[in-house]
Amino acid sequence: VKVRVGNVEHDLRVEAAFSVPRLGFQDNFFCAFQSLLPDGIQPTKFTGPFWGQCMDRVLLDMMDRTDWILCTDFDSVYEADTVQRLLTAAMVSGYDAVAPMQCKRDEGIPMFTPEGHFEIGRVEIAPSWFEATIQPVDSAHFGCTLLRSSALKRTKTPWFVGTPAEDGHWGDAPEGQRQRVEEDIAFWKTWKNSGNTLGICPQIAIGHAELMFTWPGRDLKAVYQYPTEYWKAGGRRPAAAWGSAEHAEASAK
């Protein structure tokens, strides 16, 4: 991949790593194609039920023959120039890992932890923070993230090992108890503890594909519902949806 920074053109060896299930989203595949093919970036995937194990194997497979590895999830959506912009940010900043902004499914919160804010909860960030090309963070995601191969080589192993909550289980622990650590977050902790840097690019953002239920509303306008909200409500449609119990009660008055 040729990346121009100022008057200097860099020729980088870049490949893309995928950990995928057997079935996936076509929108993701085609946006990946439009980003990877023009730059000749070869994608490699490992398939299996355990995301961390597949990602470990695909990273190990390409680590020695690349300068950078693009890790991308099978539910990410991005534009054709996203990878080039990330590579430019990586070369300008000198960071070992560079990720774009991405929101978490269901909750809609940004998927990164500002540096020094692990396990603090809600964090307020000044608007000026988002004006920078890159900002240091303690965790990010793998939606469309660049890893410097030389930094990956010095990262301690194992790479992807999560830990359960204080009670030994994987559910949400009560407040005040140690929460579970997912395998992707465990990777970033190990990455940083191995002396590597991690940055988020506030000026670059990608989408996150997720299933939504669309109901006709009581005013015949669309009402949207997350699947988790549907099941938490006992398999019930939203109150604002046509045919809901609340709709029936209002119609009976």
Where do the model's predicted regions map?
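N-proximal low-complexity "stem/linker" segments adjacent to membrane-targeting elements
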Residues: V1-G48, Q53
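C-terminal catalytic/acceptor-binding lobe
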Residues: V1-V8, K156-K253
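Polar low-complexity intrinsically disordered regions
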Residues: K2-V5, A17-S19, D75, L87-A89, ...
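Active-site nucleotide-sugar/metal-binding loop of Leloir-type enzymes
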Residues: D56-W68
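Short, high-confidence coil segments that cap the C-terminus of an alpha-helix
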Residues: T66-D67, S93-Y95, N196
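Short beta-strand-to-loop acidic/aromatic patch adjacent to the donor-nucleotide binding site
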Residues: T66-V77
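Residue-level detector of anion-binding/catalytic polar loops
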Residues: D75, D96, T197-G199
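Conserved catalytic core of nucleotide-sugar-dependent glycosyltransferases
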Residues: E79-H169
